[in-house]
């Protein structure tokens, strides 16, 4: 086998590993549509909405009643998050990608976390405030 072929197989294996990892992370997190998340927030007391976007994004727009901890600060904010230990934390960002990573991190930290599918863009598109 030539070095070029070995390199190609290695790249294919790495891409496969990356895709499998993303699928496993996605499947390990519960996802709520904007409408279902809104209904859950209205009906249940032990549900919290967490904005994981940057400070600048938060200043532009946010979902009323949500808390804010940027994704890059999640791991170092465990003490701040302890007040939500018994709640379900629904994370959101702009499109739902960063919030999925945040929910995965929170689950690893022992929290009951979920993702808002399609993020604040989906929330606004559904006519929610």
Please state what every model-predicted region is.
Residues 92:
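Short, surface-exposed ligand- or partner-binding patches at beta-edge/loop junctions that are enriched
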Residues 1-36, 40-43, 47, 55-88, ...:
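Rhodanese-like catalytic fold shared by cysteine-dependent sulfurtransferases
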């Amino acid at each position: 086998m030539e070095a070029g072929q070995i390199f190609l197989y290695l790249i294919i294996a790495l891409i496969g590993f990356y895709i499998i990892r993303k699928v496993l992370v996605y499947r390990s997190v519960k996802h709520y549509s904007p409408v279902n998340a809104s209904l859950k927030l209205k009906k249940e007391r032990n549900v919290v909405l967490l904005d994981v976007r940057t400070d600048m994004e938060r200043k532009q727009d946010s979902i009323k009643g949500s808390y804010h901890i940027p994704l890059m600060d999640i791991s170092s904010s465990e003490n701040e998050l302890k007040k939500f230990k018994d709640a379900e934390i629904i994370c959101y960002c702009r499109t739902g990608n960063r919030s999925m990573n945040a929910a995965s991190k929170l689950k690893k930290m022992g929290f009951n976390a979920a993702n808002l599918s399609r993020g604040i863009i989906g929330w606004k598109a559904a006519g929610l405030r």
